[in-house]
């Protein structure tokens, strides 16, 4: 048994898009994977079935990560099945796009609750386990919108900027116990979140002149989650954006 085949990854929002690609990528390394989903059990079960068909081990667990009680149950179910959590990928997220002056409070709050508070709840719960294990890797999915802003996404941009600050702070708090915390910031990725956008004006701001693929984001996550070379990386944000944001 290799080290990875004994490890367990929890991926939130893993029934589609980047989350699905990440669950499949981590399972391909031999890790056991918990496929979290909020609504579509059919899609989540399909991800689990694909992992099992490829020789891996996975379960699907429903939970709204913005709800503290449901997060607690998600962690309990994971531990009942696999006894440990070595990797947490905080991927679950939503958009409620509209200009600031048209944005309703519920549109603001729904995005903040899931995209930021959900990261807090899952990270806090899993950190307790990782501190006892004296090891663990947490990867938070943020966005280039959290760095550069995006009209019509004040709620989303604020939440994703918050994730970056949260990542840096928690990385400092957990580092002494061997737990790394990093963020991955996708740009425009070919998922259902972008399929209805007019690509032409967007591509003008992407030096590589194309949308990214979920698997390209998942590759960066897989590196941070599993590669020994990532053990000395913490508190960083990795852009996977075709060159949109350069510092």
From Swiss-Prot:
It comes from the Bacteria. InterPro entries: 3oxo_ACP_reduc, NAD(P)-bd_dom_sf, Sc_DH/Rdtase_CS, SDR, SDR_fam. The keyword Lipid biosynthesis applies. Pfam families: adh_short. GO terms for biological process: fatty acid elongation. Substrate binds at residue 143. Keywords: Fatty acid biosynthesis, Fatty acid metabolism, Lipid biosynthesis, Lipid metabolism, NADP, Oxidoreductase. The active site is at 156 (proton acceptor). The keyword Transport does not apply. It catalyses: a (3R)-hydroxyacyl-[ACP] + NADP(+) = a 3-oxoacyl-[ACP] + NADPH + H(+). Pathway: Lipid metabolism; fatty acid biosynthesis. Mutation of key residues to match those found in its paralog PhaB increases its activity on acetoacetyl-CoA, not its usual substrate, which might help shift cellular metabolism to make poly(3-hydroxybutyrate) (PHB), a compound that has potential uses as a renewable, biodegradable thermoplastic. Poly(3-hydroxyalkanoic acids) (PHA), of which PHB is among the most common compounds, are prokaryotic intracellular storage compounds with potential uses as a renewable, biodegradable thermoplastic. Cyanobacterial PHB synthesis is particularly attractive as cyanobacteria use CO(2) as the carbon source. Its EC number is 1.1.1.100. Coiled coil: none annotated. One of its GO terms (molecular function) is oxidoreductase activity, acting on the CH-OH group of donors, NAD or NADP as acceptor. NADP(+) binds at residues 11-35. Belongs to the short-chain dehydrogenases/reductases (SDR) family. Catalyzes the NADPH-dependent reduction of beta-ketoacyl-ACP substrates to beta-hydroxyacyl-ACP products, the first reductive step in the elongation cycle of fatty acid biosynthesis. Is capable of reducing acetoacetyl-CoA, but less well than its paralog PhaB. This is 3-oxoacyl-[acyl-carrier-protein] reductase. It comes from Synechocystis sp. (strain ATCC 27184 / PCC 6803 / Kazusa).
């Amino acid at each position: 048994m290799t080290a990875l085949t004994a490890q367990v990854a929890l991926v939130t929002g893993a029934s589609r898009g980047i989350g699905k690609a990440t669950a499949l990528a981590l399972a391909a390394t031999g890790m056991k994977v918990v496929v979290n989903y909020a609504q579509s059990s059919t899609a989540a079960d399909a991800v689990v079935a694909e992992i099992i068909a490829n020789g891996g081990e996975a379960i699907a667990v429903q939970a709204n990560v913005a709800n503290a009680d449901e997060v607690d149950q998600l962690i309990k179910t994971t531990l009942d099945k696999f006894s440990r959590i070595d990797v947490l990928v905080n991927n679950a997220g939503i958009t409620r796009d509209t200009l600031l002056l048209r944005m309703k409070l519920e549109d603001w709050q729904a995005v903040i609750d899931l995209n930021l508070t959900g990261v807090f709840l899952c990270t806090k719960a899993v950190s307790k386990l990782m501190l006892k294990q004296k090891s663990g890797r947490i990867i938070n999915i943020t966005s280039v919108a959290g760095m550069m802003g995006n009209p019509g996404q004040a709620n989303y941009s604020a939440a994703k900027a918050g994730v970056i600050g949260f990542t840096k702070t928690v990385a400092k708090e957990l580092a002494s116990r061997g737990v790394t915390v990093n963020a991955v910031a996708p740009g425009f990725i070919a998922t259902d979140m972008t399929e209805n956008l007019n690509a032409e004006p967007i591509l003008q701001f992407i030096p590589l002149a194309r949308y990214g693929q979920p698997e390209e984001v998942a590759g960066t996550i897989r590196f941070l989650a599993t590669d020994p070379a990532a053990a000395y990386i913490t508190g960083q944000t990795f852009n996977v954006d075709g060159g949109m944001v350069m510092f």
